[in-house]
Amino acid sequence: LWKLGVTAKTQHNEVAPAQHELAPVYETANIAMDHNQLVMETMKKVAERHNLRCLLHEKPFAGVNGSGKHDNWSITTDTGMNLLDPGETPNENIQFLLVLACVIKAVDTHADLLRRSASNVGNDLRLGASEAPPAIVSVFLGTQLEDVVRQLVETGEARSCLEGSTLHTGVSTVPDLPMDATDRNRTSPFALSLIHI
């Protein structure tokens, strides 16, 4: 893939038998989409050369996890500033809160378009009603941002910000781990997984 210009940095096993995930390096959205298509075409050709089949159908077998094909995105300025970066104290980051409000409003206003872009028979079968149903367009903020937004709605200002929690492993040889306050919600097709929280 690197020879084709696709800078894939990660690959790992997924839930279904012989299912793998590939994560390319972030790049401009339209190039990332083109690379996504190129990766899928390349995987099919390489599999064929080895007398295998690469199944890219969203739900090839009932009762077995399907294949997701998506691109994560962000909004950056021409100078590289990430407008979806909440910083260490999102309750004080006015620029971030403004952009966040605009994204939430856009999802609410254009839910029908988002639904049409994410929904097809294969995706409905893959996700069903118990994971991330494309029929329901929602925004998941995570506990920290949800609290900041709640404060803004109820009082007009956000004076505090919840701290991230810790996962206590209970194993003496494994350290406790910080938990991401915005980790994606599997029931939301529009989940904010933000950095620095």
Region spans (language model):
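Long, compositionally biased intrinsically disordered regions
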Residues: 189-190
